[in-house]
């Protein structure tokens, strides 16, 4: 009321925004206090003609929210990231949430007169609905991902936002996690990321003069990108004699496709430097079904 009285005193009819809550609809002291603040703005608008924007925000989540206070998402992210216990009284409770970046986008739009309205109230147009149990299940899956080299399904907008939120609560000692390097006298092969529907991402290192590969696949396919060193990639269609060759280097990166039905290899042409190759494969390696058959190019 002090702000509104001051604006009226000086005849300033600039727009006024208030951050309220969906709990303003509840019949409890907190809800009553929120409704009282809203009504002050609506009365001020009727009296002065000034534009008012009343946002009833649902649960807001995102990085830097204080855990163990009034945000279940912040508490769950923080405690699970730190291997601390959580309590879920009723996992079937339905939550309506808005992401902090979406809130900021809406308020920036409101500054330009492009707010989203629903009757007397303004709103953030992107609201995510999920059960409390569903949130916990997702966050717990995030905690396990470094051990399985997996990543979330980022095609789902809420999962993408929740994963970013979860990462912001990681203790610093978990910013990094080790990878298993499969090392032999030829170099190494290291899986980085494994996905259920987008294949596998790996790094291959070949020592000077080493040839790797010399095999083909029925269905499995790969993309090779040399990021350091100087090498030769060769492919030959099974049952034919013609060899297709690509001289590659980290100085001019390019993708070379490993085509199903073509035996292929990769040769480190350097006598002194390792050949470092980023590799994508359309499926994660399954030792029970390797789909890999030895044959020299």
Predicted features and spans:
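Conserved beta-loop-beta element that borders a ligand/cofactor-binding pocket
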Residues: 39-64, 84-90
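Double-stranded beta-helix
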Residues: 239-242, 267-297
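A conserved pocket-lining segment of Rossmann-fold NAD(P)-dependent short-chain dehydrogenase/reductase
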Residues: 58, 78-98, 117-118, 123-124
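Conserved Rossmann-fold NAD(P)-dependent oxidoreductase catalytic core, especially the SDR/UDP-sugar
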Residues: 2-36, 45-48, 53
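Short acidic-glycine-tyrosine-enriched beta hairpin
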Residues: 237-262
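A short glycine-rich, His/Asp/Glu-containing loop-to-beta-strand
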Residues: 173-214, 220
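Mid/C-terminal beta-alpha module of Rossmann-like enzyme folds, strongest
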Residues: 109-180
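Substrate-positioning beta->alpha
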Residues: 65-75, 92-112, 133-137
């Amino acid at each position: 009321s002090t702000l509104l009285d001051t604006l009226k005193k000086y005849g300033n009819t600039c727009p006024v925004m208030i951050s309220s809550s969906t709990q303003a609809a509840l019949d409890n002291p907190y809800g009553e206090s929120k409704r009282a603040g809203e009504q002050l703005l609506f009365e001020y608008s009727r009296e002065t003609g000034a534009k008012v924007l009343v946002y009833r925000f649902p649960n807001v989540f995102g990085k830097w929210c204080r855990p163990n206070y009034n945000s279940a998402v912040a508490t769950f992210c923080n405690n699970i990231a730190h291997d601390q216990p959580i309590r879920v009284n009723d996992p079937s409770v339905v939550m309506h949430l808005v992401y902090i970046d979406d809130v900021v986008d809406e308020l920036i739009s409101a500054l330009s007169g492009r707010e989203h309205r629903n009757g007397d109230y303004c709103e953030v147009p992107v609201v995510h609905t999920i059960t409390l149990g569903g949130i916990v299940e997702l966050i717990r899956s995030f905690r396990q991902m470094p051990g399985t080299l997996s990543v979330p399904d980022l095609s789902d907008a809420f999962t993408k936002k929740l994963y970013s939120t979860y990462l912001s609560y990681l203790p610093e000692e978990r910013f990094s996690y080790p990878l298993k390097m499969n090392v032999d006298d030829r170099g190494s092969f290291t899986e980085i990321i494994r996905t259920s529907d987008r294949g596998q991402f790996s790094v291959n290192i070949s020592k000077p003069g080493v040839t790797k590969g010399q095999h083909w696949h029925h269905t499995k396919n790969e993309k090779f990108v040399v990021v350091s060193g100087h090498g030769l990639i060769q492919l030959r269609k099974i049952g034919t004699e013609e060899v297709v060759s690509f001289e590659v280097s980290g100085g001019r990166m390019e993708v070379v496709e490993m085509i199903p039905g073509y035996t292929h290899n990769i040769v480190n042409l350097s006598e002194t430097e390792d050949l470092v190759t980023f590799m994508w494969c359309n499926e994660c390696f399954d030792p029970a079904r390797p789909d890999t058959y030895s044959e020299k190019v």
